[in-house]
From Swiss-Prot:
Organism from which the protein derives: Rhizobium meliloti (strain 1021)
Protein name per the record: sn-glycerol-3-phosphate transport system permease protein UgpA
Annotated GO CC locations: plasma membrane
Primary gene name: ugpA
Biological function: Part of the ABC transporter complex UgpBAEC involved in sn-glycerol-3-phosphate (G3P) import. Probably responsible for the translocation of the substrate across the membrane.
GO BP, sorted A to Z: transmembrane transport
CDD domains per record: TM_PBP2
Annotated keywords: Cell inner membrane, Cell membrane, Membrane, Plasmid, Transmembrane, Transmembrane helix, Transport
Amino acid sequence: MQRVVFPNKILPYLLVAPQIVLTIVFFFWPASQALYQSVIREDPFGLKSGFVGFANFSAVLSEANYLNSLKVTVIFSVLTALLAMGVALLLATAADRVVRGKTFYRTLLIWPYAVAPAVAGMLWLFMFNPAMGTFAYMLRRNGFHWDPLLNGNHAMILIVVAAAWKQISYNFLFFVAGLQAIPKSLIEAAAIDGARGTRRFWTIIFPLLAPTTFFLLVVNTVYAFFDTFGIIHSVTGGGPARATETLVYKVYNDGFVNLNLGSSAAQSVILMAIVIGLTAFQFRFVEKRVHYG
């Protein structure tokens, strides 16, 4: 391997300086502020503050609303990840078999990823709006009373569908890349041995997609935890009756709406610990490679 030699010793540091500055400004500084705010308590006007240690964490972990948000987040994350990955794998498998127009279909399937989360949420809200939504009208015609504004289960279904639709394109790209990396000789050998399409998929293709699937499982879980705020805020606002209030949305409610900065900061630190744990878990196990032979 040829070693890269820079003409100036300062040049490498200058090249990485913008990224270092961005990391300090947008990660280390906010993280340090969250850690500081999580161990102090301020008065409602922000004039006085005092050190309280882990009292904010103790109050958060014993709060019924926080435990409810944790349950909602787990349910929402599992459903979103399974739906987004399942549909993406189905579409990737179908697109991989297309001979003519393959690039065109793949481009169409990638478009939803470019849609902003709030826009994606409003799109699905309009379609399932109880008063004027097309899909809501179809459900009523079939005797199903759809009302995500009052029914918590309906609201959960709506944000899961919207969040999964937004993430399908991302998963689709990785699954297509994983399918293309599988040696065709293995599939052809299985076909010669008499294995049908479904059996070839479950015994050969899907096991070889294990690294990609595991990687996407972690990514989709992190996505559902942290990147769906815009969808929830635009569709349900955490309601009805906190039925869709995830951990991230509760941080927003406590910090920016109720101005309880100590509790909000403690929740942020807990979320930061969760994402660090998920990332470490991913780096620990995703390095396992599949060897073709």
